[in-house]
């Protein structure tokens, strides 16, 4: 069993965040000894899932719903699966958008490196899009995809 301070340190979270999660009902089986929260392996695993879902952009109210479904048992497996599939699709879309942004940055870094070498943008502008070097053409095309 771990104290709230130990868990906060393990996960790199403020103690206030763990208290908030507890108040939101995200640790339904959390034990208390003389008013002190005691985190076991179940809560640590729940916290790993909570942090994953938060990083995936899920709101606390939806995480709470997921945790409630977990306590309801196997009958909620289909709901949980749909929730994760929807979040996965959302993340895949976000990753694609981020990759387009990254490719634009790669292209612009290359573009300005060429402009600096030439002392002008004239030559590099004339290369776009057909005569770009292969190593940068894919980044340009992905960045400009609609």
Residue ranges and their predicted role:
Residues 7, 25-26, 44, 71, ...:
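Short linear sequence elements within intrinsically disordered, low-complexity coil regions
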């Amino acid at each position: 069993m771990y104290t709230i301070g130990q868990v906060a340190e393990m996960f790199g979270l403020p103690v206030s965040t763990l208290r908030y999660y507890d108040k939101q009902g995200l640790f339904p089986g959390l034990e208390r000894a003389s008013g002190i929260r005691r985190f076991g392996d179940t809560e640590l695993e729940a916290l790993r899932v909570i942090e994953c879902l938060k990083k995936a952009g899920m709101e606390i109210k939806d995480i709470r719903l997921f945790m409630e479904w977990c306590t309801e048992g196997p009958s909620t497996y289909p709901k949980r699966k749909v929730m994760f599939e929807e979040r996965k699709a959302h993340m895949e879309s976000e990753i694609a958008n981020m990759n387009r942004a990254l490719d634009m940055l790669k292209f612009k870094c290359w573009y300005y490196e060429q402009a600096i070498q030439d002392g002008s943008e004239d030559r590099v502008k004339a290369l776009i899009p057909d005569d770009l070097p292969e190593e940068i053409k894919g980044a340009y095309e992905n960045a400009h995809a609609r």
